[in-house]
Amino acid sequence: MNMDFKSAKELLDLCEENQLPISEVMRQRECLLGETPRDAVDHRMAKAWEIMHASATQPLKKPIKSMGGPIGGEAKKLETHYNKKKNICGDVLQKAMTYAMAVLEVNASMGLIVAAPTAGSAGVVPGMMLALQECYRISDQRIVDALFNAGAVGYLAMRNATVAGAVGGCQAEVGIASAMAASAAVELMGGNPQQCLDAASTVLMNMLGLVCDPVGGLVEYPCQNRNAAGVANALIAAELSLSGIRQLIPFDQMLDAMYAVGKRLPAELRETALGGCAATPAACAACGLCSGN
């Protein structure tokens, strides 16, 4: 049976024809195209989840200072604030933001993370998965299933557009990570394949045009904050979709729109650290690049 797909439409068709969720279509695709046994494919994804889990929790036990210096300890501050019962966000969002920011601290200190789809956006998917797991007592196996769903969305983005900030801006990095997380969350919470991709499309609509402007050229700031924003965006999109709100624009078309917008961004706003936040006087002074002229 051919389980390969090159577009979201083809993916939905496979799901409908075989009465399978996105996660299972993606799993079978990996098995068939990679000529790899199911157990081996599952083992690799379980290992990815193990690394995600560790990177999302390690900085909460011992805050980590980044190599560049701009970030370190933010995740622990969020957790402490939450424990004081003074947070204004609900449990899922508070936890998701905390874990997402924690992963960026590990990445910025040269620790082990899973690029999902990139290092600079690596906190969004694990942040979402771990928050849902804790709040809804979800098993590791179901999380692994959801990660195959996220992988399907990431694969489509890499095949038909880009996940590189240098090509498409932050909308292509945190934006796609957020789309992956939203789709996975919808399946995890009982949504159907159409709802999953509706959520992914909503995410990209909400983040369309977001630039990539790392201060000092480091994948630290504003990247960490944007991972928190990305997982919040994913939760919003997932909730809208699960409530039955349909997305007007299909994921394939939204992906095309994101790619087109990204290619029109000037070079200064595509990971060169020459524009946006990176070009502000405060940012230049903070990274030692301010000449005073």
Task: Give, region by region, the residue ranges found by the protein language model.
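Generic N-terminal targeting/processing segments that precede catalytic cores or assembly contacts
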Residues: M1-G111, E134-C135, G244, F251-N293
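Glycine- and small hydrophobic-enriched segments that form the cores of compact globular domains
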Residues: I88, A115-A122, E134, I138, ...
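Glycine- and acidic-residue-rich phosphate-binding/metal-coordinating active-site segment common to enzymes
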Residues: L147, V153-A166, C170-M180, G191
